[in-house]
Amino acid sequence: MKKIGIIGVSGYTGLELIKIILNHSGFKLSYLAATSEGEISEIFPQLAGVLNMKVEIADAKEAAKRCDLVFLALPHEKAMEFAREILEFNSTKVVDLSADYRLSLKLYEKNYTKHLDPKNLSHAVYGLVEINREKIKKARLVANPGCYPTCSILAIAPFVNFIDKNIGVFIDAKSGVSGAGKGLKTTSHFVSANENLNAYSPITHRHADEIKEQIGILAGSEIDTIFVPNLVSITRGMSVSVFAVLKEKIDADKILKEFYKDEEFIRFRDEPVQIKNVVGTHFCDIFVRTACNKIFINSAIDNLLKGASSQAVANANLMLDEPENSALPKIAYGI
C-alpha cells in the first residue's frame, strides 16, 4: 500500500481527495494536515464513522517522512513553500493542486507573485494526463491543472493544428459556485449567487495564460486566446464553449475520436454536453460541430473532480505505478 498525505485537507478538494483515496485499493491515508488540529470528522461531519483520523498542523518534513506521495491542496503562493521542503528532504513525490508550478516563471510572476522555487518549477510536469501521460510517470513533482484549463484544453487540443492562429480562440466558460473555494466571498454568498449568472475577470482571468501557454505548446506556436469565465447558480460542474475559425474544411468528429481513441475518461457526445452527466465523475464529455470554416467545441467536467481531485489522483496513480483508472469515479450523481 502506498502511503498518502494531504496538506490543506480542510477545503473542498481535500474532502474529494479523501473520498477517492478511501476507495483506492493501493493507497492508504497516512497524513492529514491543515492550519489547525482536530478530528477530520469535526471538519467534515459526513466522515464521522467512516474515517477516524487526526488532522495535524502542516509540517513538510513530517509529511515527507510518513508518505510516498503528498497532495498539496493549498492556496497559491503557499504550496511552493511546502513542495520545496518536501522535495529537498527525501524522495517523496508531490502533486500540487495550486497554480504554483503550472506556468512558466514569467507568466507565474505576471499573474501571481515572485516565485520562491524556480528550480523545481523548471522541471515540474503539467499534469494533464491525456496529454502528458509519459512525462507524468517519471515525475517527482506534478502541477495539477486548473479546472477551467482542464475543460478548455481537452476541448481544444485535438484541433490546434486546424485553427486559424491569427484569429485565435474564444472560450466562454461557466462554473458552479464551488469553483470559488470554501472561503466566503460576496459573489459566492447565497443571496448573490442564487438564481444568478455573471461573468468575472473577463479576458484578464489568471487561467487565460495557463490555457494559452498549454495550447501554444501543443500547437508549436502561440494561439491568441480570449477567455471569459462565468459563475453559475449551481453547486458544482463546469461547461466550456469554444469558438474558432478553421484554416480548412475538416471532419471534426473523426479528428476528435481519433485523438482520444484510447482515453477511457473522454466521452464523445452527439448533442451539446450536459453538466449533470459528469458531476460526480472523472469524465470529460465533448461535443463538436462545424459550419463552413467555423468550429464550436463544447466540453463539461466536474470542477472538483476532473478539474481538481480525481485528476490529482490520476496523476498520483501514474507516478506511483498504480493502474491509471484506480478509484476514479465513473457514475454521475444524476438527480
Swiss-Prot record:
Keywords: Amino-acid biosynthesis, Arginine biosynthesis, Cytoplasm, NADP, Oxidoreductase. The active site is at C147. Pathway: Amino-acid biosynthesis; L-arginine biosynthesis; N(2)-acetyl-L-ornithine from L-glutamate: step 3/4. CDD domains: AGPR_1_C (cd23934), AGPR_1_N (cd17895). One of its GO terms (cellular component) is cytoplasm. Its EC number is 1.2.1.38. It is found in: Cytoplasm. InterPro entries: AGPR_AS (IPR023013), AGPR_type-1 (IPR000706), NAD(P)-bd_dom_sf (IPR036291), NAGSA_dehydrogenase (IPR050085), Semialdehyde_DH_NAD-bd (IPR000534). The keyword Plastid does not apply. It is an enzyme of class 1 (oxidoreductase). It catalyses: N-acetyl-L-glutamate 5-semialdehyde + phosphate + NADP(+) = N-acetyl-L-glutamyl 5-phosphate + NADPH + H(+). Catalyzes the NADPH-dependent reduction of N-acetyl-5-glutamyl phosphate to yield N-acetyl-L-glutamate 5-semialdehyde. Belongs to the NAGSA dehydrogenase family. Type 1 subfamily. NCBIfam families: argC. This is N-acetyl-gamma-glutamyl-phosphate reductase. It comes from Campylobacter hominis (strain ATCC BAA-381 / DSM 21671 / CCUG 45161 / LMG 19568 / NCTC 13146 / CH001A).
